[in-house]
Amino acid sequence: MATVTAALVKELRERTGAGMMECKKALVEANADIELAIENMRKSGAAKAAKKAGNVAAEGAIIIKEENGVAALLEVNCQTDFVAKDANFTAFAAEVAAAAVASQATVEELQAQFEETRVALVAKIGENINIRRVQYVAGSALASYRHGEKIGVVVAGEGDAETLKHIAMHVAASKPEYVNPSDVPADVVEKEKAVQVEIAMNEGKPQEIAEKMVIGRMKKFTGEVSLTGQAFIMEPKKTVAEILKEKGASVSNFVRLEVGEGIEKAAEMSFADEVAAVQKG
């Protein structure tokens, strides 16, 4: 049997909002499989915030560069928001992004290309800096949007520039995972369906009735995770699909990056802990 470590319990607690003992019990029952534990906790109603997965932790910036029908979205990280606004850091990030869109290099290739520059910048600024990831979007019509330095979106499709720009803004705010409801993978649909059936049965419904109830819930689920199924943020009474149809536009692809997605930030030390650490030192 796999060992349930304190680190696993801590991660599950952060991702679900459930109590420490509840998390430990769920991990024991799931043989230390954290994803299975979350699924089981959702079924039982124990998870209060399972969507909290991927704590936003690292600082830095998202840079977008477009060239010849290709857009590059680049994430460069640092340790503090102060350095993220430093002119040397922003110039470095812009230089890497320009090289990325020109060559469509992988993140590993960019890291190798700029390692010497990065090391020199780390020595100058005094913080660790990392070229974390890069993604590319190609299309005859591209629209990009950055929310501050922290969120970047590029949308590829057909239509006027203003409409596609508004769609990019919607993606930044609403975080869709797929373009259309039909794009949601079958395994994702089946996994969510199993969770919803069990939730309905836990409400005391016979399985046959529970499965019928789930049809509506699954339609809502695929709509919520897909761009065209979501309520348009600027006109909430209409879906994005309806807006696109009205404007004679379409979306074929999009990429959304947010600084620090999936990076867990070390817990900040309290003042009392700092004092204790100083006394020990």
From Swiss-Prot:
It comes from the Bacteria. Its main location: cytoplasm. Pfam families: EF_TS (PF00889). It is found in: Cytoplasm. GO terms for molecular function: translation elongation factor activity. Gene3D superfamilies: 1.10.286.20, DNA helicase RuvA subunit, C-terminal domain, Elongation factor Ts, dimerisation domain. The keyword S-adenosyl-L-methionine does not apply. InterPro entries: EF-Ts_dimer_sf, Transl_elong_EFTs/EF1B, Transl_elong_EFTs/EF1B_dimer, Transl_elong_Ts_CS, UBA-like_sf. GO terms for cellular component: cytoplasm. Keywords: Cytoplasm, Elongation factor, Protein biosynthesis. Residues 80-83 are annotated as: Involved in Mg(2+) ion dislocation from EF-Tu. Belongs to the EF-Ts family. Associates with the EF-Tu.GDP complex and induces the exchange of GDP to GTP. It remains bound to the aminoacyl-tRNA.EF-Tu.GTP complex up to the GTP hydrolysis stage on the ribosome. NCBIfam families: tsf. This is Elongation factor Ts. It comes from Aliivibrio fischeri (strain MJ11) (Vibrio fischeri). The gene is tsf.
